[in-house]
Amino acid sequence: MKRTNRRAFLATTVTGTAALVAGALGRADDAKPQTSLAALILAGGQMAMAQARYAAMARQADADGYGQAASLFRAAARSKEANVTDLGAVIKKLGGKLECDAKPGEVKSTKENVAALIKAETEAGETTLPELVAVAREEKNKEAVRALNYAKAAAAEYATLFAEAAADLEAWKAGKKSVYVCTVCGFPAYTLPEKKCPTCFDALDKFTQVS
């Protein structure tokens, strides 16, 4: 196979893989990646699915009367959007392409959705993404390690924020809640950091307010 044809073949394969993993949230034991590119594709599919799912959960929270929880769900969706953009850019540099037909999946009551998000983000931050980082680190792919670590850090933050919400969910009914989201790495905060993003160290003008 000629080199140019091989690159086209690989790009097509990666695109197909993205479609297969787009529905994943959490571990994917039957599809453990062996390369940085495959790890990025898997993570990108997961992030795209989470983005769609959390946006749908935000709408459900609004319908259930949990305005502040809806704001946090919207922030989570915005963070995943940032992660998808970042991961997709690194995938492109490696000659791949991220194409995901992400659907929200099952959306239940707000209480159940909060619990589902905590479980998914905890698993992503503590297990799935660290495993993918290890794959990228083995190949010494610094860009892949960086992008995956950004996604991992954001997942850990949301697991904590939603655990706090779950502890007193009834208090999250009144009004909206402002969340500042870094559009580079997805880091969320209720108040702007003093000088720069604590995860990616970008300037504060990279933050967007979500409510």
Over which residues does each language-model region extend?
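Non-heme di-metal
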Residues: 2-5, 10-21, 28-211
